[in-house]
Design a protein with these regions (language model features):
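N-terminal membrane topogenesis motif
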Residues: 1-31, 88, 233-253
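Signature of the first transmembrane helix
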Residues: 12-71, 139, 251-267
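Interfacial transmembrane-helix starts/ends
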Residues: 15, 52, 85-102, 243, ...
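Helix-loop junctions and terminal segments of transmembrane helices
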Residues: 67-82
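Alpha-helical transmembrane segments of multi-pass membrane transport and lipid-handling proteins
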Residues: 95-121
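Alpha-helical transmembrane segments of multi-pass membrane proteins
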Residues: 110, 114, 125-148
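Membrane-interface junctions at transmembrane-helix termini in multi-pass inner-membrane proteins
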Residues: 142-164
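Hydrophobic alpha-helical transmembrane segments
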Residues: 164-178, 187-219
């Protein structure tokens, strides 16, 4: 009876989470449409091309960096009932995953920032180099956000993911337009104005990641108060074991998503 009640409660929580994600997806779409026309007026077709070039490279690296790991985290975390032993296990999975995400994010940011001009020339738009540099820190922010999202989704808590998506979209809308308008009014060259618009995207992504990490840290403090002093009755898996399980789930997802993204880049090149 107790397990049936838990399953019913978890099922209701999952459906509620799906509804939240659907609403956030609709909100993000609306915000995105509200963003496009004003941005085009500020940047024009050429500036918008710089923006799109930077976004394509950013999207490709984000897919390669985060497509599989949040899914793998969710798989490893799913099925827990919130008992202290499970909280101890979830903490270890989160910390190992966060270290992996952070490493990938730093490497991804460097892969965009250092050869930015090379990326721009490969995509046939040398003027987009400044925009690619402006978006490079967003790769690290997306990786950190992915760790937190994977954690919450593994616990069937979709609210943080939904809220963070709206924060990111609003940051892109408000800050991206504000930065672009400011640069245009100051008479900045078009590539610089486009880079300022991209910087708004980066700022929104950083704000989203910061909110998720704050939410995760706050939850950890609250859960810590309820944890017993003694260890759980089973040994926690080691870091290498967790890494192997993460890789087993994440690599196939990442490879398939990467192939699709590369095909899209080829279509736009």
């Amino acid at each position: 009876m107790k397990s049936a009640v838990i399953r019913t409660r978890e099922g209701g929580k999952f459906l509620s989470g799906v509804s939240l994600l659907t609403l956030s997806a609709v909100a993000v779409k609306v915000i995105g449409h509200a963003y496009r026309l004003p941005l085009l007026r500020v940047l024009g077709a050429a500036g918008r091309g710089d923006f799109n070039t930077a976004y394509e490279v950013y999207a490709l690296l984000c897919v390669l960096s985060t497509a599989g790991l949040p899914v793998a985290m969710s798989v490893l975390l799913a099925g827990g009932d919130g008992a202290p032993a499970y909280r101890a296990l979830s903490r270890r999975i989160y910390r190992v995953s966060l270290a992996v995400f952070c490493t990938i994010g730093v490497l991804g940011t460097a892969a965009l920032l250092l050869p930015a001009r090379l990326w721009a020339e490969m995509l046939g738009n040398p003027d987009a180099a400044a925009s690619i540099r402006a978006v490079s820190p967003a790769v690290l922010a997306v990786c950190l956000a992915g760790a937190a999202r994977g954690y919450f989704q593994g616990l069937s808590d979709m609210k943080p993911t939904a809220v963070s998506q709206v924060i990111e979209a609003l940051g892109k809308l408000i800050l991206g337009l504000a930065f672009a308008y400011f640069a245009a009014r100051r008479g900045a060259p078009l590539p610089v104005t486009a880079a300022c618009a991209v910087l708004g995207l980066t700022a929104g992504t950083v704000a989203s990641a910061a909110w998720l990490l704050f939410r995760r840290a706050r939850q950890d403090r609250r859960a810590g108060d309820a944890l017993p002093v003694d260890m759980p009755p089973f040994p926690l898996p080691g870091r290498r074991h967790i890494l192997r399980r993460l890789a087993a789930v994440a690599l196939p997802v990442t490879l398939s998503a990467g192939v699709i993204s590369l095909a899209k880049c080829e279509d736009h090149a």
